[in-house]
Amino acid sequence: MDLKYKLGNDVIRIVTGKNILKDFACELNSGGNISIISRNVYKKYDLSFIKNRIIIDDGERAKSMEYLTLIINELLNKRVERGDSIIYIGGGTTGDLSGFAASIYKRGMGLIAVPTTLLAQVDSSIGGKNGINYMNIKNLIGTFYNPKLIIDDISFIDDKKLMMDGLAESLKMGITIEPELFNIINNDPDYIIENIERIITLSINAKLSIVSKDFHDKKHLRYVLNFGHTIGHALESYFNNNISHGEAVANGMIIEAYISKCLGNADISNEIRSIIKRLGFKIIDFRSVDINRLLEYIKNDKKSESGYINIVAVNGIGRYKIEALSPEEMLKILGGMP
């Protein structure tokens, strides 16, 4: 796939394929361009053809003032100009930090994205959001800033656990926005792997269909992209981040589909549970969860407004609406979870 999309005021080129990164070696090494590379990715893959590089740690620790300052200092020391580009090669945290640095250095320089996880390829690299954490608050400081080029090299996707995290996000979009995506993922693992490039393309198109109408996230149209995340983020906090994002979102989708049913929508919670189980996600035994403590995390969700909790309620595949619940209503429904 080699297509161009308009997003906000920008035109973004997205190229998807296998073993394609070296095809862009000249562009990546052009002028004062500098690559910010995840340490894990740099250790695992031969990226010696990339000449001008900064290696950073993985994970939320890198999304900090410390690492931002390190990058800005390197850009200054290497006399990087505004017309040059930052290239990031890594997962979502590498992209968040690099995108923010590109957006503020000399009021904005070029940005090229090379997401190396399925999660980053189908989700975090699309939509322009970036940021760093501050005072233990996630993504407190950030901007909306698009890459001019996204290179989705599927040869990086060779870790089963990381692939599952990405499939959870693709399934989310298949349930709410793109039924064809749902139908592909609702298959055996071999079929899914054979169709991974198609999954990436459909996921990108699904997300772009939403963010292109609400680039700066002002109209609440992006709410649908949070299906499974209101509960999922709460589960991550509840378990002290000892479960992966994909596992949290997968379980969040099961629970939010159950909530949807309780609100009078079509019951697809068992269908979603079956797919998630087949994908290999661990399904949380909700009977062992302290509902009151979980509710406290749910109430902290950034999409909550005026004391009400906003949920993406699914009403069949490809159909959804936003429902607002009081904490008392949420507690009552969660208390009845099987």
Curated annotation (Swiss-Prot):
SUPFAM superfamilies xref list: Dehydroquinate synthase-like
GO BP term (any one): aromatic amino acid family biosynthetic process
Binding site for NAD(+): 58-63, 92-96, 116-117, 129, 138
Catalytic activity: 7-phospho-2-dehydro-3-deoxy-D-arabino-heptonate = 3-dehydroquinate + phosphate
Required cofactor(s): NAD(+); Co(2+); Zn(2+)
Its EC number(s): 4.2.3.4
CC annotations in GO: cytoplasm
Keywords for the protein's UniProt record, in alphabetical order: Amino-acid biosynthesis, Aromatic amino acid biosynthesis, Cobalt, Cytoplasm, Lyase, Metal-binding, NAD, Nucleotide-binding, Zinc
Chain residues that bind Zn(2+): 169, 229, 245
Localization per Swiss-Prot or TrEMBL: Cytoplasm
Top-level lineage group: Archaea
Protein's recorded name: 3-dehydroquinate synthase
Organism this protein belongs to: Picrophilus torridus (strain ATCC 700027 / DSM 9790 / JCM 10055 / NBRC 100828 / KAW 2/3)
Gene name in the database record: aroB
